[in-house]
Amino acid sequence: MGSKVTGVKIKGIGKYVPEMVATNEDFTKIVETSDEWITQRTGIKQRHITNGEPTYYLGAMAAKAAMADAGVKAEDIDLIIATTVTGDYFTPSLSCLIQREIGAIGCIAFDLNAACAGFVYGFDTAKRYLQTGDGIKTVLLVASEELSKFVDYTDRSSCVLFGDGAAAFVLELSLIHI
């Protein structure tokens, strides 16, 4: 006789990056650097940069892509967790702006602020909500950053590192029989 273990299933994945691309060659025009210097130290060849799109827009586009991939509608979402350090406003939260953009009115929505680890903390939080069995069946987890608006483009050591974009997962509970 086997037992059941509860896990989390990634039902859908989405991403969104702005169209504008900044290459390493572009950075050689604004700071003393070279493509070789950047690539050897970071592995980065290019990064996407917004052209006025707000952080919530990036997140909403990734969310819509994840929902399409999962085959779920806005009304299927029970919880939205958004992670960012570059939100557009102090309030409303990024999650509430994404909630409005995708039409998931009525679900729980909140932000987590944990910088680079935000998506990992968000995944763990989503898992715990799903495992409570308290009505949360589908979670939309979104990480959205627009770091270009805070970059010091005179600091060679950091300006070459950051770009803008968003990723999203649609998560559901999964029972594993072992």
Show which residues each predicted segment covers.
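Conserved catalytic cysteine-centered active-site region
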Residues: 37-41, 45-57, 85-139
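Short acidic, glycine/serine/threonine-rich loops at helix termini
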Residues: 21-22, 91-93, 151-156
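Conserved small/polar residues in nucleotide/adenosyl-binding loops
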Residues: 176-178
